């Protein structure tokens, strides 16, 4: 769309219709003046006789898109959606997917332990099962984002977790919860590293994704499990563990 100069104002003359260009102006406006009203000039609107377009086109889509068309891959194996997505960011996301799956696997092992008939701490079993599912959802969310940006998901091996969580001094509940707190802090470090990689590669979209989907939630999880650890340290290994377990059993949304 072309912009044209607005119509200029002019001054009327009653008995004569002299037309002069605007003084000290490069515009094409005119001045009409009159003496019928004394020496005062009466301003009025008049149409410019020379409607010249302004220069400076903001956006020329068909010209600018030419360079983008050259970037669209023609090889069948190449992603069509990929744009400003570095190999470094792609690899780090695959590493984070592996972290989330490994943590999920450990939590699932904890769920299986506390669900045993000779342990029977159903609240802790519920907590770690929900935590395992949440970490798996995190991994899947990262996989979806990887595909969205045109990267390739490469799943890596998962380490076999422990099957026994009883501790001679701390007991099983406190030991497992302290382990969970360590895992959440480790996951947070990995997420911060992923955010750092995104920033170094000027990938604002990846940085925003990590900030909005993971970092805030991770802080909340660390706070919640820290409180659980503090409470279990107070109750020791005795009857208080059962009361703590009942609290988790009847609490909604207890997963980290």
Swiss-Prot record:
EC number in record: 1.16.3.1
GO molecular function: ferric iron binding; ferrous iron binding; ferroxidase activity
Swiss-Prot/TrEMBL catalytic activity: 4 Fe(2+) + O2 + 4 H(+) = 4 Fe(3+) + 2 H2O
PROSITE patterns noted in UniProt: FERRITIN_2, FERRITIN_LIKE
GO biological process: intracellular iron ion homeostasis; iron ion transport
Pfam families xref list: Ferritin (PF00210)
InterPro entries: Ferritin (IPR001519), Ferritin-like (IPR012347), Ferritin-like_diiron (IPR009040), Ferritin-like_SF (IPR009078), Ferritin_CS (IPR014034), Ferritin_DPS_dom (IPR008331)
Transit peptide: 1-49
Keywords in alphabetical order: Chloroplast, Iron, Iron storage, Metal-binding, Oxidoreductase, Plastid, Transit peptide
Region (Extension peptide (EP)): 50-82
Subunit structure: Oligomer of 24 subunits. There are two types of subunits: L (light) chain and H (heavy) chain. The major chain can be light or heavy, depending on the species and tissue type. The functional molecule forms a roughly spherical shell with a diameter of 12 nm and contains a central cavity into which the insoluble mineral iron core is deposited.
Family the UniProt entry places it in: Belongs to the ferritin family.
Name used for this protein in its record: Ferritin-3, chloroplastic
Annotated source species: Glycine max
């Amino acid at each position: 769309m072309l912009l044209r100069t607005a119509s200029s104002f002019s001054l009327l003359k009653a008995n004569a219709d002299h037309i002069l260009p605007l003084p000290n102006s490069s515009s094409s406006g005119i001045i009409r003046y009159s003496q019928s009203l004394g020496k005062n000039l009466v301003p009025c609107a008049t149409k410019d006789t020379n409607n010249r377009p302004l220069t400076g086109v903001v956006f020329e889509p068909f010209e600018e898109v030419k360079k983008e068309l050259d970037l669209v891959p023609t090889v069948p194996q190449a992603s069509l959606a990929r744009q400003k997505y570095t190999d470094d960011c792609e690899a780090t996301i695959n590493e984070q997917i592996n972290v989330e799956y490994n943590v999920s696997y450990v939590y699932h092992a904890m769920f299986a332990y506390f669900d045993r008939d000779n342990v029977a701490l159903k609240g802790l079993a519920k907590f770690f099962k929900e935590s395992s599912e949440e970490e798996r959802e995190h991994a899947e969310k990262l996989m979806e984002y990887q595909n969205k940006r045109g990267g390739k998901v490469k799943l890596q091996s998962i380490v076999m977790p422990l099957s026994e969580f009883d501790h001679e001094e701390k007991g099983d509940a406190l030991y497992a919860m302290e382990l969970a707190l360590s895992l959440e802090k480790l996951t947070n470090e990995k997420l911060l590293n992923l955010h750092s990689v995104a920033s170094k590669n000027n990938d604002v979209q990846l940085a925003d994704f990590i900030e909005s989907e993971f970092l805030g939630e991770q802080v909340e999880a660390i706070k919640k499990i820290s409180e659980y650890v503090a409470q279990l340290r107070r109750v020791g290994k005795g009857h208080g563990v059962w009361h703590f377990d009942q609290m988790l059993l009847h609490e909604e949304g207890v997963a980290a």
